[in-house]
């Protein structure tokens, strides 16, 4: 009997293949999804809402060759083990595989095998317990993809009509954008308040430490209490007089307590991503890439962690016993009195997954240094430490708060804490809390009641002027936490949300902080006003709960799709009717400064809002914060950097992919490609030249006169012939056919190809086989 096992990734296939080759089981990989909705042919009918939500599929173009090879392998086998990932998406991929294979092999038997870790024991156990496909999970995944498709397909074109083309809306991305935009608006609306912090330095036993003002008369003083300058000056003067008169601090009260800090549960997807952001500074997608490699077993030996898309912190009984025994052996004083099992706080924790843990706790990070490298090692170390720490005792701190009287009118306070028992901190140091303030604990000497301490002068009384700060921008960790708290998204989608928003141009990420672009704010405002229910956090959370009910068989998938589709389609039709005949531009009250005849119009462009004169003869355009034709805005010039082409000053500008610098004489080009200014030079943000691909100058352009025609290697090492003027009118693809170059410049074709080939080979070691002939041909 011939048997085939299908997993998702080649590396996993290689690893599992080593376990099963003696059994005659061939293992191959689907390389992810094998089919997708046929949007090109069926458009909005790819999921036909008027015909029972019938879906029309096509082989995924990027995976077509591999899928056809896989189908040929399955043509004559007796049994196929569907061993894709143990979640809804994996179940759906298995169903698509089964549907395709059945067309080629009607007598084939299909068995579903699931496993949470990749090692021989787990794989053989999964085969022994093979089941049928879970169609409830398949339907739940179809509902998710169906709603995502319908929402995106019908809502996105409305954005095109209302704002500009190329924008998109999404069932999950739009509520996430709302979260970020609301924070952005909080920051913009924030008005800082000035306050003063008053402290003094004192000492005992040669240990100096600061104490903070905590009482004036009978009034308590908090960190931000003193906001009146006259009040501050009055009491600052009195305090300085007391210091000058040798007034001493008298210990009034010493409060001590034991504070314990418990270990956190083993990782789930969201907490792993949060810690990776805090501790390693990684993006969510980088974290998931490293986790995928650890799960599959990059060395080809076995997987190193359990499945990494989970919202359950549960340890299997076998793993719980193993981790606890390891801790008892290696950390006998720090291990808990008994094994600790954790449970999910979420009622919607998906499927029967475990937490993210090492497949074998005895494989310490140190022992795997030669096997795991770079990101994989760092993430494995974090997972290993967190898993072991979850079975250890709490850390114990002695916390001390000392109150000092400074005359009868003032009190000061000092806080300190000392770690007296490490507990789980033996193996795991927690990352900084999200956007948390730093602890103000200080090292304190041994102090007793009624002790008298003198101020250290200088500095004496220290008064610091400070300002309240706006709410911090989200990073990927804090965004994931908020989405999880709201019940938006699932473990499989957390990493993709920031990436999707960034790719759409709705957000930028700088130093791990997320800023919403003007475009993102505009899109959010439109969706929030026209689709309020669909970006409502509770609605999105309820939708996730319903999908969980479909997955568990408690709700019919068609019923759920109908519940979504009816009201949504009605709203879409209403909005389209409202927008009919409306312009994307809005008239402002600002008169055109160039012609003085018309009010400027405002609309959204690729880089955000811009204003323009409606008179086509005027051609006035204004991009806020940039140089524009007709007037000047405030611009930032680079110091000591001049344009190497014309000697002009270099201006820092904002582009779609970040900041860059440009010559002040570079005004861009008109639609016909003609220059608006006298220069075309652009560079990096610091003024250094861009890393341009190697290019071979062929000759002067016959259309532009002042530009060169050149060959450059960009795509698969195939040279492309272009004009320096990107808007070259001779070819709409911006690429110029070889024949046209030969005819226009009167040069030999064979000689041209030979010279270009030798140039790239000799100068850059690029082996080029042929020139890109023009827009109708495709490079090999």
Residue ranges of predicted features:
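C-terminal or mid-to-C-terminal helical accessory/interaction module adjacent to the motor/catalytic core
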Residues: 118-200, 257
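Short acidic, hydrophobic short linear motifs in intrinsically disordered regions
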Residues: 254, 262-276, 301-308, 470-482, ...
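Intrinsically disordered, low-complexity regulatory segments
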Residues: 1-145, 151, 159, 224-230, ...
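Structured, non-catalytic alpha/beta "coupling" segments that mediate domain-domain communication
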Residues: 14-41, 174-221, 323, 328, ...
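Conserved short loop/turn motifs at secondary-structure junctions
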Residues: 1-2, 85-87, 164-168, 256-265, ...
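Basic, low-complexity terminal or inter-domain segments flanking catalytic cores
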Residues: 2-4, 156, 311-780
């Amino acid at each position: 009997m011939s048997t085939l096992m299908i997993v998702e990734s080649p590396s996993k296939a290689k690893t599992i293949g080593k376990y099963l080759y003696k059994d005659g089981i061939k293992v191959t990989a689907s390389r992810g999804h094998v089919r997708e909705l046929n949007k090109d042919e069926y458009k909005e009918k790819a999921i036909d809402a008027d015909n029972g939500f019938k879906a029309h599929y096509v082989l995924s173009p990027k995976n077509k060759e591999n899928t056809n090879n896989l189908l040929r392998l399955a043509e004559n086998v007796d049994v196929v083990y569907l061993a894709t990932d143990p979640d809804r998406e994996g179940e759906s991929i298995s169903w698509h595989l089964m549907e395709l294979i059945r067309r080629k092999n009607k007598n084939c038997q299909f068995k579903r095998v699931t496993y949470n870790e990749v090692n021989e024991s787990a794989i053989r156990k999964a085969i022994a317990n093979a089941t049928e496909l879970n169609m409830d999970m398949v339907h739940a995944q179809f509902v998710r993809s169906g709603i995502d498709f319908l929402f995106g397909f019908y809502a996105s074109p409305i954005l095109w009509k209302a704002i500009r083309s190329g924008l998109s809306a999404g069932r999950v991305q739009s509520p996430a954008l709302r979260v970020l935009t609301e924070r952005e608006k909080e920051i913009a609306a924030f008005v800082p308040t000035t306050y003063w912090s008053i402290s003094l330095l004192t000492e005992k036993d040669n240990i100096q430490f600061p104490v903070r003002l905590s009482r004036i008369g009978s009034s308590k003083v908090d960190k931000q209490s003193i906001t009146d300058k006259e009040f501050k000056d009055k009491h600052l003067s009195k305090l300085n007089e007391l210091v000058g008169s040798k007034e001493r601090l008298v210990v009034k009260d010493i409060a001590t307590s034991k504070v314990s800090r418990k270990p956190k549960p083993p990782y789930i997807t969201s907490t792993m991503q949060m810690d990776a952001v805090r501790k390693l500074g990684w993006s969510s997608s980088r974290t998931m890439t490293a986790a995928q490699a650890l799960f599959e077993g990059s060395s080809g030996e076995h997987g190193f962690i359990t499945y990494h898309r989970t919202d359950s912190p549960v340890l299997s009984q076998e793993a719980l016993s193993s981790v606890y025994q390891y801790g008892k052996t290696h950390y006998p004083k720090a291990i808990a009195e008994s094994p600790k099992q954790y449970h999910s706080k979420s009622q919607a924790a998906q499927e029967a997954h475990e937490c993210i843990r090492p497949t074998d706790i005895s494989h310490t990070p140190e022992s795997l240094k030669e096997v795991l490298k770079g990101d994989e090692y760092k993430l494995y170390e974090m997972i290993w430490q967190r898993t072991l720490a979850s079975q250890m005792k709490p850390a114990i701190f002695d916390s001390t708060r000392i109150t000092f009287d400074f005359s009868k009118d003032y009190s000061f306070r000092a806080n300190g804490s000392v770690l007296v028992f490490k507990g789980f901190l033996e193996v795991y140091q927690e990352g900084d809390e999200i956007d948390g303030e730093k602890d103000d604990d200080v090292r304190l000497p041994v102090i007793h009641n009624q002790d008298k301490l003198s101020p250290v002068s200088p500095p004496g009384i220290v008064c610091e002027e400070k300002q309240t700060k706006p709410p911090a921008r989200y990073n990927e960790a804090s965004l994931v936490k908020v989405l999880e708290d709201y019940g938006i998204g699932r473990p499989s989608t957390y990493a993709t949300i920031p990436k999707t928003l960034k790719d759409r141009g709705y957000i930028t990420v700088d130093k791990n902080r997320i800023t919403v672009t003007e475009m993102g704010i505009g899109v959010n405002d439109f969706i929030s006003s026209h689709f309020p229910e669909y970006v409502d956090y509770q609605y999105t959370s309820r939708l996730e709960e319903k999908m969980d009910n479909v997955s568990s068989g408690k709700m019919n998938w068609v019923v759920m799709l109908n519940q979504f589709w009816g009201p949504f389609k009605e709203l879409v039709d209403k909005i389209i009717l409202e927008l009919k005949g409306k312009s994307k531009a809005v008239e402002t009250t600002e008169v055109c400064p160039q012609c003085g005849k018309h009010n400027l119009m405002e609309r959204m462009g690729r880089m955000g809002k811009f204003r323009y004169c409606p008179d086509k003869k005027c051609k006035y355009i204004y991009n806020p914060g940039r140089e524009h034709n007709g007037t000047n805005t405030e611009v930032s010039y680079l110091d000591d950097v001049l344009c190497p082409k014309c000697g002009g000053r270099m201006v820092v500008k904002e582009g779609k992919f970040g900041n860059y610098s440009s010559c002040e004489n570079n005004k861009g080009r008109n639609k016909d490609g003609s220059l608006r200014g006298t220069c075309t030079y652009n560079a990096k943000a610091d003024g250094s030249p861009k890393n341009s691909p190697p290019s071979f100058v062929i000759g002067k352009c016959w259309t532009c006169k002042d530009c060169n025609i050149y060959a450059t290697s960009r795509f698969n090492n195939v040279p492309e012939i272009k004009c320096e003027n990107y808007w070259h009118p001779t070819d709409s693809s911006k690429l110029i056919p070889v024949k046209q170059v030969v005819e226009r410049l009167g040069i030999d074709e064979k000689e041209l190809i030979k010279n270009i080939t030798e140039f790239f080979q000799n100068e850059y070691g690029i082996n080029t086989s042929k020139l890109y002939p023009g827009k109708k041909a495709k490079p090999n």
